[in-house]
Structure formats: C-alpha cells, structure tokens
C-alpha cells in the first residue's frame, strides 16, 4: 500500500471541495487525517474573494451552491476532536463527509455541538460516546500530535495530500496528487 494521507480541517471550505473530489475517485489516499489548520504556519483569513472562488469551484465540480455558516469562520476544535475519535473507530471518512456537508452544503456552524452530533449520527456514531470521546485528553493529544506530525511532514495549509514524501496543498492540487499516486502505484506493481 502507498503511504499517503489526506489532511483536513472541517472549518476549511477548500478542504470540503477537496474531500468531495477525493471521494469522487482519487483512488486514495489511504488515511484521512484530521488536523487543526489554525496551528499551521500559513493559517490565513478567508475573505470575500476567496468565498467567491469557492462558490465558482463548487459549481464547476457539480456541487450544490455553498451555504456559508452564519458564524464562518467557526471554531472547529470540537468537530476536529470528534473527527479524531471517528478516525480512531474507523469512521473518519463518513464523519468528515457528513460534517463538511453540514457546514458547507447545509450552512451550519460546526462550533455548535448539535450540528456535530447530527453529522456523527449520520455515520452511526452514538451521541453519548461522541461527547465523551471529545472530552478525553487522549483524543485532544492525538489531534495535537497529528497536527505536529503534519507540520513535520511539510504540511503548511489544508487541504493537503501527502504521497510518500511529497505534499500537495490546496484544493486545486488534487490532480498533482492523483498523478503522484498513480506513479507510486506503478512503481509498487513493478
């Protein structure tokens, strides 16, 4: 198997667009890794021009129009702790998909625990277990460690896809990541 990961933060509309493309057939990566974008070296504010670009890109990808959460940008730490728990129990992809869609297709603020729980319920995660896990120090530490490891691997922004030692950042880098995965798979087969 090719060593690869998709790094995301549920507060990132660009990660939402990238996640939809990864789900639509990137052919990998093997691991979906939640990290805190606010701790990355290049965390930047998201202005009006960037919102318009996201709207245009969503349309190009055939997604419904983006509905911006009223509190955007929202504090994603609770949602990211739940994403870390979801990864721990093998539900990272369905939880991330449901949460991204809650935020950017539904226009819901993921700093509100109710919307995080709706996303969790959509992928069969029990609300009491989710709330308990989100408060565990071990989950907080896993998220901090994953963010630090991503930075160490060269991730400076989300979304990012790592294929072996190469990191591809930004929603529009999906094609570069796809080519790297294809090349790595060809080398693995030979």
Feature map (PLM): residue ranges:
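C-terminal cap of thioredoxin/glutaredoxin-like
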Residues: 4-6, 10-28, 101-190
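Structural alpha/beta surface segment adjacent to cysteine/selenocysteine redox centers
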Residues: 10-103
